[in-house]
Every structure is written in structure tokens, then in C-alpha cells.
């Protein structure tokens, strides 16, 4: 009996010692908070796994609910890694715009190292002068071969020319499907049409809708968003990288195939490159590489491998977001036929049928613009920005944020915040129309989909123009529908860009 009591006391003392040691390690690992500041609040997480179970399959929803309790600045753990979560339009603008230099970093996540061998402009951890110079170069190239006017074309700019051509081909492909099976999955055809636009801008060429290499690449692209979406456990718990993981293996395969495809395209451009005759973005990057003109003051040069990475970033950003936006738009059109009719009435009144829509028509089509804004807001198909990280010790709203802290920016929460939106769960384009029939500029600027500040998507303007032009050309010519009684599944599938379930029951007819 005495022996048992002695053992129980020993066990109790040992357990107490372990508890105190663990408590001390946790306290010691937390950064010292400067006087006058405090640590961000947040719920207690499980040992080892943190809040993974709480995040579930829809982290944007879980973290939005959490923000209602803990506020717009809160902290969770994924595994043992602390993650700052930002919600609320004012808070996010404060962090990414007013304090942009503090929050412009990228965390060195495992999945990010697999993109462009860790040298991606969008996903890589660099945020210094080299990154800034590459970003400026990419922006200039994108502007030169999309927004700039083409003297040999009647279109207002290169982008308008490319989109107009691809929209006409897309309509023809959909007509073929109606003449055959009598229905179609629009995503299958939209994705190639949009990919062809960015291919024309980057490589000066387009591909047939049955081009097998391009088809295999774009069909794998969904896996990309699934892995790099905010909250992927393998990014925070190293052991998960070594367990069987179909998504992660597919992600590695996709990045290798994309990289190989880009290398092949750039090698072909080098063979046919002619100084003074710049055909596309790739040619312009080669010219900068040869003349070492990326940033003369900093003496920064662009290597051949960096060209591959820049083009890869532009290609990825230029097709996935636009494809997803158009695909969601079509889903909203068939589930809201009243809205579709109203857009077409506006097109008929402003443009008619004798000419195709142009980018210059955009400011005269407020209901079309309101529909696109409401599609962006309601779907919020980019629920989080690509994760940020802090570049130095800083503070936000009275909370201390140490250097190197991973930061999730919840765009979905902004777009569904009841403080900003009346009945946010309702799809209502009219919310963006003022009493005099114009777009409400103040309200439209509250829709956040492309990030803010120094890491804002460089292709935002072009993406908005492209979505507008594709939809305007399609809806001027075509009416979309699904058969009576067919249920359209609008449930988002979580990822970096959230897709909807495939709908094979789309139908279309040319407008009389």
C-alpha cells in the first residue's frame, strides 16, 4: 500500500513537472510583447495539430465565424505554427495599404517552394529590390501586349483583338455541341478560350481546342488551387509531406509539366528572336535579358531561368482567375434568367446587333458591370489572398505582430460582411446601381478579390476587362439555359480559387 502511494506521488510530481515544462516552453516561445501592445486573441488549439480540425473543409467560413467572436485581428495555430488572420475591410486596408511594407512578405511554405523551383514572383519569399524590379518588368510587358493598341488591327488594343477572336471560336464550339449531344459543360471550352488569350499575349500564338498538351495542363490546374489554398496542413506539419498524398503528388506533377512547357516555348522564342521585332511578352523579356536593362541602377539582371518563372507567373495568373470568373458568371446567368434578360436588353439598347461589343462600351453598360461585381462579391471565388508574411516587427490595431508571421487575409469575409452589405447572401446586381442608373463607385470599391497593396494582382485591370468583353460578346449573341427541373449545384469547392461542381447540362441558342 505504501509502495502504491509512493508511486502515485512520483507520477503526480512527474506529470506536474512535464506540465510546467510544456507551459514554460510555450510561454518562452511566444514573442515578448512591447509595452502598450498585446498579443492577438484567438481560441485554444489542440496540441500538435493546432486548429486544423476547426478550419475543416471551408477555412474561409470557419475563420469568418471566428472573427465575429475574436475580432478582425486574431491568431490561430496550424500545427505548431502561429498564423495571423485578418478580416474587416478597414483592418485589411490598414495592413496591406497603409502598412504595406510591413505586410508585403510571403511565408516560405513548402508548397510555394515547388512552384518555379521556389523562384516564383507571386509565391516566392523574396520581397526586396530584385522582386520589385521583376514585378515592374512583368507589369510593363503585360501592359505593352494587352492594353496597348495594335496599329495593324481595328480593335482598340491587343486584348480586345484576342478576346474577340476567341469568343467567336467559343460560340462556334458551343454550337457544335448543341448540334451533337445537345448539351455541354461550359468550363471545358471556356478554359481553352481564356488560355489562348494569355498564350497570344505571352507567346504570340493560339491553340486548337483539342490540343492535347494544353488540355492536359489546364485540366490539371484545379489541383494547383487545391494545394496552395490558405490552410493546407502539409505546409505547416512537415510529416504530412511524406505520407501518401494524391493532391500533393498531382501538384508536383503539374508544376513540372508547366515548367517544361514554358521552357520549350522560350527555347523556341530564342531560336526565332529578332532584335527590333518584338512579338510578345516573351520576346520583350528576352530583349531585357540580352541588354541587361531590368534595373540598371541596382545592376539587377534577368537570367534565362527567371524569364521562365516570370512567364509562368503571368500565364498562371492570366488564365485561372479569368476562367473561374467567367464560369461562375455563366452559373449565375442560368440560375437567374431575369438578370440575363436584363443584361441583354442593355446590350441591345446601347450596342445593338450590328457590331460586336468593345472595351470602350464598358462605361455605358452599368448593369453588365453590376452583374460582374456581384458575381465577384457573391462567389468570392478567391476567398483568401495568397498568404502574406510580415517583413519586420510591427503592430496592427494595438496588437503586436513579430517579423516572419504568416498572415491569412480573408477576402470572403469582407465580401459577406453584414456591416458592409445588405442581405449579403442574396445575389442582387442592383445593389451596385445608384438611383440615377450609374455604378455606385464607393460600394464597388468594397468588393475585394484581387488583393490590395504591394502584392495586389498585377493583372487585375486586364482580368476585369477580359471578363467583361467575353461576357458582352457571348450575351449579345447567345442565350444560356439549363433544361427545366435540372438542379445547378452552386456549392463552392475550396481552393486558392474556388470552383463549382461541373455542370454538364448547359444549353444555348443563338438570339434571334
From Swiss-Prot:
Protein location: Endoplasmic reticulum membrane; Mitochondrion inner membrane; Microsome membrane; Cytoplasm
Cellular component GO terms, alphabetical: endoplasmic reticulum membrane; mitochondrial inner membrane
Keywords tagged on the record: Cytoplasm, Endoplasmic reticulum, Glycoprotein, Heme, Iron, Lipid biosynthesis, Lipid metabolism, Lyase, Membrane, Metal-binding, Microsome, Mitochondrion, Mitochondrion inner membrane, Monooxygenase, Oxidoreductase, Steroid biosynthesis
Principal location listed in the UniProt entry: endoplasmic reticulum
Matching InterPro entries: Cyt_P450 (IPR001128), Cyt_P450_CS (IPR017972), Cyt_P450_E_grp-I (IPR002401), Cyt_P450_E_grp-I_CYP1 (IPR008066), Cyt_P450_sf (IPR036396)
Catalytic activity: an organic molecule + reduced [NADPH--hemoprotein reductase] + O2 = an alcohol + oxidized [NADPH--hemoprotein reductase] + H2O + H(+); estrone + reduced [NADPH--hemoprotein reductase] + O2 = 2-hydroxyestrone + oxidized [NADPH--hemoprotein reductase] + H2O + H(+); estrone + reduced [NADPH--hemoprotein reductase] + O2 = 4-hydroxyestrone + oxidized [NADPH--hemoprotein reductase] + H2O + H(+); estrone + reduced [NADPH--hemoprotein reductase] + O2 = 6alpha-hydroxyestrone + oxidized [NADPH--hemoprotein reductase] + H2O + H(+)
Binding site for heme: 457
Binding site for substrate: 224
Glycosylation sites: 67
Annotated PROSITE patterns: CYTOCHROME_P450 (PS00086)
The keyword Oxidoreductase belongs to this UniProt entry's keyword annotation: yes
Swiss-Prot/TrEMBL cofactor(s): heme
Stated role: A cytochrome P450 monooxygenase involved in the metabolism of various endogenous substrates, including fatty acids, steroid hormones and vitamins. Mechanistically, uses molecular oxygen inserting one oxygen atom into a substrate, and reducing the second into a water molecule, with two electrons provided by NADPH via cytochrome P450 reductase (CPR; NADPH-ferrihemoprotein reductase). Catalyzes the hydroxylation of carbon-hydrogen bonds.
Subunit comment: Interacts with cytosolic chaperones HSP70 and HSP90; this interaction is required for initial targeting to mitochondria. Interacts (via mitochondrial targeting signal) with TOMM40 (via N-terminus); this interaction is required for translocation across the mitochondrial outer membrane.
Protein name as it appears in the record: Cytochrome P450 1A1
Organism in which the protein naturally occurs: Macaca fascicularis (Crab-eating macaque)
